[in-house]
C-alpha cells in the first residue's frame, strides 16, 4: 500500500514496523470525532477560499457517507493505513476520488489527533458526570430513608462515636460532588480547539480557526501552535480526576465488603450483585465490590503511564504521544463500568438496622458524650476525659457498658454525675444532640440532603 506520506521514501515499510506503528486497533473509537472534525475543516477550507466551495461540499458529503458506512459495518479499517485519520481519508478518497486528497490541506495529523482526543474526552466527561450525578441522587434517596438508622462511626476501624447510616452515606455524596467539580474543571481546559496548529508551526493558509471552533462547539482556540499539538495535560488531569473517583468508590467498596461479612453483618448484598464459590457451598461473596476495589489500580496505572510518557518529551509532537490513547481509553472505560455497576449494587443492598444499632451500643461509643456531660456540669475537659477513661476500664474489667452502670457506680468516677446522665449517654440521643451543621443529628442530615438536592438541580 502506498503511504500518504511516502513521497520521500524509496523502500516499503517493514511489516513488523507496520504492525508496531499502527494504532488503528485502539484509535478506531475516535472515528466519529475524526469525521466531525474533518467535515468542519473541509467547510472552513471552502469558506476561506482555500479550496473551491463545491469541492468542500463534495468532501463533507463524502465524509457523511463514510460515517454511515462505518456505523453500518460496511467499511473496514486496515493496519497498513496506520491510524484512524489515514483510514478515514482513504475511505473518503475511494468515494469522492482525487478531490478527497485536498482534505488534508493546512492540516497535520498532529493537530488532528489533538482535536479528536479533546472532542472525545469532552463527551466522555459529560457521560461520567451524568453517572456521578445519578449516584449522588441515589445516595441522597438512601440517606433520606436512614436518618434514624444509628450505627457506629469509626476511627482506626474501631468503634468511636455513634452516627447514622444517612450521615455516613452523605460523606460519600460529598466526595462524589467534588469528583464532579474536578471533572468540570478538567473539561474547561479540554474545551480548547487545537486545529490549525499544523504539525507544530501553524500554516501559511488563511485559516478561520474560530469558525472551526464554533462549528465543533469549542469554547476557545489554542493560543500557541507548539503547545496545541504537544499538550496532553488535559488527559493527565482527567486520569487524576478518574483516579480520585476510583479511590472514593474503592473506599466505599471496602466498607461494603466489611459490612457484608459475618463479623459486621450490617448489610446483605442482593444475590444479583454477589457470587458463590466453586468449592464452598455456603459462600456469598461481594465480588462486585472487590472488583471495583481491584480496578482502582488500573486507573492509577493509566495516570502513571501518561505522566511517564510526557515527562521527557521535548517540544513539540513526538510519536510517544500515540501511547496516550490506550491509557486514556482504559481510564474512561473503567470508571464508567464501575459507576454503572456500583449504583444498583448500593440500591439493592439490605440494611440490617438492628445489627447496626447493636454495634453502636457496644464499644463505648457514648464515652465522649459522658465526658461532654461532665464538662457541662463544670468539670474541665481533661479531667472529664480521665474520669470517663477510668469508667471505661471499669466496664471492660466487668463486661459492662456505661449505660448499664448504676448511678452509684458512675459517681465513683465523678460526684457531678446525676440522674440525668442516662439521657445524655443514650445512643440515639447522643446522635440527636449533634445538631451542628454537618453533624449526624436527623434534622441536620435532612437539611444536608435538602441542600445537596438543590445543588444537583442547579448544576447543569
UniProtKB/Swiss-Prot annotation:
A molecular function GO annotation: argininosuccinate lyase activity
Pfam families the record matches: ASL_C2, Lyase_1
Catalytic activity: 2-(N(omega)-L-arginino)succinate = fumarate + L-arginine
Keywords associated with the record: Amino-acid biosynthesis, Arginine biosynthesis, Cytoplasm, Lyase
Cellular component terms (Gene Ontology): cytosol
Keyword Transmembrane helix recorded: no
Principal location listed in the UniProt entry: cytoplasm
GO biological process terms held by the UniProt record: arginine biosynthetic process via ornithine; L-arginine biosynthetic process
CDD domains: Argininosuccinate_lyase
Assigned protein family: Belongs to the lyase 1 family. Argininosuccinate lyase subfamily.
NCBIfam families: argH
The protein, known as: Argininosuccinate lyase
Species of origin: Pelotomaculum thermopropionicum (strain DSM 13744 / JCM 10971 / SI)
Organism lineage string: Bacteria, Bacillati, Bacillota, Clostridia, Eubacteriales
Protein encoded by which gene: argH
